[in-house]
């Protein structure tokens, strides 16, 4: 109910902007039972400055300026990381690098970011714990610049590398993510789990061999160099398109196909597009450890709509001094 109240507030400002012929963006700060709205591209920064640990920030569609770092335990929702014809929603963009933490050894436990396009790098810069980045697009590298524990990326579109920066990652989970490039550079005894994901280009890099990698239910496109999956990696129910798995890798129920186009129902290669669902051509043949199809369509599925309520259709008309508004709203699970 609280989220729907915030939705109505956001809707109010949307239609006011519509009536005024402007294209405003807004950020709503929820602190307990109090909601405060901030208008304009600096709205996110203003909401952040006013927030305390445990608060929620809801960003409208549109472009927001980034901030120096996020060093408060907040939940941040956007409208989605790309325009969506099905829900009739547009993109929420944070323009610039997003840094979680302030570079100190301070522990930040429970940050959640969902439904946002981050137009730049993402840096994990403090001792982060139980952090979830969900249904987001990150246009450049993700860099783990500090030791972390139980960090999850779920249903994200990641255009750059995931770089461990020689730090210790205790329980890094990449789940139902499309990763265009590589994941590497983790310190001794790190544990990294890639599940129901697409990995674009795995190539060997120093220090990966010292981390424990668990690969499950994933599609791995390109492999090159020495130990591209990690030394003594465990690999279960994955699909490859090359046979250079290399030594000291434990393969279980894996498949090798000749071409990426052989696996997807649409017969296309692995290139990303907003309309693709990455359904498998033979989902009953290529089954994961959990009984669902290997790849993005299995597990939690390839779902890009954030879990906060969204306005799918707005119709605002002026009749004299009266503003008449009709709208449709929905919520994702």
State where each predicted segment sits.
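Predominantly extracellular beta-rich ligand-binding scaffolds that present long acidic/polar faces
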Residues: 121-125, 144-145, 150-272
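C-terminal accessory segments
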Residues: 255-305
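Bacterial Sec-dependent N-terminal signal peptides
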Residues: 1-23
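Acidic glycine-/aspartate-rich tracts in secreted/extracellular proteins
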Residues: 62-63, 79-84, 240-246, 260, ...
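Detector for repetitive beta-architecture
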Residues: 54-56, 61, 67, 73-75, ...
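Short, compositionally biased P/S/T/A/G/V-rich stretches that sit at domain boundaries
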Residues: 292-323, 330
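Right-handed parallel beta-helix/beta-spiral solenoid domain characteristic of secreted/periplasmic
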Residues: 74-122, 161
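Acidic Gly/Asp/Thr-rich repetitive segments characteristic of extracellular carbohydrate-active
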Residues: 27-64
């Amino acid at each position: 109910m609280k989220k729907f109240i915030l939705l109505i507030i956001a809707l109010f400002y949307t239609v006011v902007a519509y009536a005024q012929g402007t294209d405003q963006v807004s950020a709503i700060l929820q602190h307990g039972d109090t909601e405060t709205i901030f208008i304009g591209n600096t709205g996110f920064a203003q909401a952040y400055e006013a927030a305390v640990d445990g608060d929620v920030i809801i960003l409208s569609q549109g472009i927001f300026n980034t901030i120096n770092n996020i060093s408060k335990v907040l939940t941040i929702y956007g409208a989605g990381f790309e325009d969506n014809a099905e829900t009739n929603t547009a993109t929420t963009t944070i323009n610039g690098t997003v840094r979680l933490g302030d570079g100190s050894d301070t522990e930040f436990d429970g940050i959640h970011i969902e439904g946002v396009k981050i137009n730049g790098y993402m840096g994990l810069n403090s001792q982060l714990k139980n952090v979830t980045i969900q249904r987001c697009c990150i246009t450049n590298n993700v860099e783990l610049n500090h030791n972390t524990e139980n960090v999850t990326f779920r249903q994200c579109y990641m255009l750059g590398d995931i770089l461990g920066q020689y730090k210790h990652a205790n329980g890094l989970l990449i789940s139902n993510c499309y990763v265009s490039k590589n994941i590497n550079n983790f310190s001794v005894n790190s544990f990294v789990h890639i599940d129901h994901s697409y990995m674009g280009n795995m190539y060997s890099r120093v220090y990966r061999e010292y981390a424990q990698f668990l690969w499950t239910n994933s599609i791995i496109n390109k492999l090159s160099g020495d130990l591209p999956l990690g030394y003594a990696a465990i690999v279960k129910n994955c699909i490859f398109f090359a046979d250079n798995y290399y030594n000291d890798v434990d393969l279980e129920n894996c498949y090798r196909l000749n071409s990426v186009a052989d696996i997807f129902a649409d017969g296309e290669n692995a290139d990303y597009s907003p309309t693709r669902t990455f359904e498998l051509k033979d989902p009953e043949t290529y089954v994961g450890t959990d009984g669902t199809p290997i790849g993005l369509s299995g597990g939690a599925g390839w779902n890009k709509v954030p879990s906060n309520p969204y306005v799918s259709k707005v119709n605002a008309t002026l009749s004299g001094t009266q503003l008449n508004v009709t709208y449709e709203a929905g919520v994702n699970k």
